[in-house]
Amino acid sequence: KYRELAEETECDFEEKDAFVYTLTDWQKIEREVQALETLGFPAEFVQEVNLPFDTEGAVKFPRQAQFQPRRFLAYISRDLNIYEHTFIQELAPGCARYDGGTITARRMIAAPQFPFLNKHGADFLKLYQHRSYVMALKNVSDVRGMYVDEAQKGMSFRNYKDYLLVGGGSHRTGRKGGGWEELQEFVQEYYGIGKAGYYWATQDCMSLDGIPYIGEYSPNTPGLYVASGFGKWGMTTSMAAAHILTEMICGRETGWEAVFDPSRSIWKPQLFVNTLEALAGLLTPTMKRCPHMGCALKWNPQEHTWDCSCHGSRFEEDGKLINNPAAGDANVAK
């Protein structure tokens, strides 16, 4: 669908091969290839990749693509009415309340990064957030494809025009991680570059089992749908969510509803990690608290922000809200 829509707009759409590589477990990659072939997807095992270090092989996915998401969104939303600065304070079946009144609709989709209905869906148990970092390096070798490590904390690589985009340093929001320092050390070692041309960070919402939550918000909220927990595959999963939710609202089945069901079992190992993280945040002795559910805020010296490790809310140095699920600013003057 992206390829079809991209033909109608200038969004720097580029067809490229994609690779998932491993540094340690080539057998895992071979099993992945076998599973993909069984399902009928074009994929192959390759031993040589265009990266500055040795790998144990990779899965190659031919004819994948990258594009500029803001230009793409500007095009597909050109005929829509988008109301900014309309902060939703309460969401219920059939209505959404904000400072200026109430919005009503028979069907509603909640698609924030982190859903904010604590009394429905138990999202505060089922979701957590991750930070990751990117540096853009100019005039370095073309890796001729898009690469991501199969390990959660691995590196990613792809080119855009004259730049190589190197990503990594991932960690749970509010916890110490590699961050910019890890990324800077890597580009210095492998590319001899002391300072990147551009650099930025991103935040992703993660589900307990790595599968997004797409479907009815909860059994007790008829007509209210949700799409969240896209992990680090937001552009891919958002299109899948659009298709699934459209079919559900129109009363048609896709066959994928049970896979992405937001009410599926949450008894996963990550649930216990989330629970322990929340308990640690609640019991940490500090006056600086997240307004979402009262967890302790921790100072992030690399980005000069106050971060919550429980659910991933982030605040500027003066307490102004940056990332949800918190719905307001934090009091950090204490």
Locate predicted features.
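Short loop/edge segments at beta-strand edges and connector loops
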Residues: 15, 47, 84-86, 90-92, ...
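Flavin-dependent oxidoreductases
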Residues: 91-160, 167
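Helical element adjacent to the flavin cofactor pocket in flavoenzyme catalytic cores
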Residues: 35-37, 58-107, 111
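Rieske [2Fe-2S] iron-sulfur-binding domain
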Residues: 135, 284-334
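A structural signal for short hydrophobic beta-strand segments in well-ordered beta-sheet cores
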Residues: 88-91, 156-157, 214, 297, ...
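Flavin (FAD/FMN) cofactor-binding and adjacent substrate-gating region
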Residues: 1-72
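C-terminal catalytic lobe of FAD-dependent flavoproteins
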Residues: 35, 45, 63, 151-152, ...
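A short, glycine/Asx- and small/polar-enriched loop/turn
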Residues: 27-30, 52-56, 91-105, 207-211
